[in-house]
From Swiss-Prot:
Gene from which the chain derives: crl
InterPro entries in the cross-refs: Tscrpt_reg_Crl, Tscrpt_reg_Crl_sf
Family as reported in the entry's similarity comment: Belongs to the Crl family.
Protein name in UniProt: Sigma factor-binding protein Crl
One Pfam family recorded for the sequence: Crl
GO biological process, one term: positive regulation of DNA-templated transcription
Subcellular location: Cytoplasm
Keywords from the named record: Activator, Coiled coil, Cytoplasm, Transcription, Transcription regulation
Coiled coil spans: 90-111
GO cellular component, one term: cytoplasm
Species this chain originates from: Salmonella newport (strain SL254)
Function: Binds to the sigma-S subunit of RNA polymerase, activating expression of sigma-S-regulated genes. Stimulates RNA polymerase holoenzyme formation and may bind to several other sigma factors, such as sigma-70 and sigma-32.
Start and end residues of each stretch annotated as Essential for activity: 99-122
Amino acid sequence: MTLPSGHPKSRLIKKFTALGPYIREGQCEDNRFFFDCLAVCVNVKPAPEKREFWGWWMELEAQEKRFTYRYQFGLFDKEGNWTAVPINETEVVERLEYTLREFHEKLRDLLISMELALEPSDDFNDEPVKLSA
């Protein structure tokens, strides 16, 4: 499948995978890509498969000359589902912001190398983390 930008989807998936453990290929559809990051374990006592994590997820959409994004912070529960919830621990929020900024920078650099822009979705108003200068 070729995306609106003219790039083959399979090649983009490979490039996105090389950015780190973020892309969820099974949740990517058509010209949309899904990334997430399980940044902070809520409680290490349960068995690994039953642990919950604070983290973020990002949806990326391929368009003609750019990719647009929207992201959320929240809880990745033991069933493997994301829920947007407020996070009150300063250290956790700082870690989430750091990992999101790091990923955003790598993603932006990759897209620039392909002569594509990375911009917030037109309807994405909630930008609690400053991602670009």
